[in-house]
């Protein structure tokens, strides 16, 4: 089901519809039968992060975040059309459950936070975007205390350091994570892919690439993608260890840096097969 939620069947370029556009009763302006709700988009984002699909999770998260300056500044609206990037007239412009679905995917998804105040434990299972070198989350509540978390990439590891609360126990669900002194050291994948999601112009229909699935093997990364037939798309590649000699099937890896050189990103370009509407493509990286 996660593949379908990430696909154009459910996902527009501005969020996730509440049902498939292939059912007989689909209506893109119906409140419950085809409109796009940021509430559902946020739920899908959290589910994708928990299923270790951070590219789709980040895309849906940033769609919700982008809505905070689309209508009333700082607020997220209640619902939009399921066919065109347009707010529906009966949508509440400041809908609390929509705004909550900006925060929840960030904290519970991207940063992977889980609380157990009874034993003063914070579980941290982050899946930061490949283009992020550092991040800080401030004033995280834990029982009667608050703490800050600093995230810093160091080669093939992500270092998570807490400050501000005594006696906090950090743990993680990510494989290989361990405490080193006062910090949590989390192994990073050898290869990561970055995406820069953007909202389309107002009134647009759905045209952007969709990342349906991502599968990390010992020395491979396979992406299942969906895009408009014959279109070209670009992602970015990050290598967290030297000398990997990454090869790509059905894609071309550029030699020049993408963006700031210190991020270590290189462009990945690929073309979808010819066809009407959305078609699928699989891209595999090996090293």
Whereabouts are the PLM-identified features?
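Non-catalytic C-terminal accessory domains or segments of carbohydrate-active enzymes
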Residues: 119, 123-150, 158-287
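Active-site core of glycosidic bond-cleaving carbohydrate-active enzymes
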Residues: 1-118, 159, 164-171, 183-185
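Broad hydrophobic/π-residue packing in well-ordered secondary structure
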Residues: 37-39, 142, 152-153
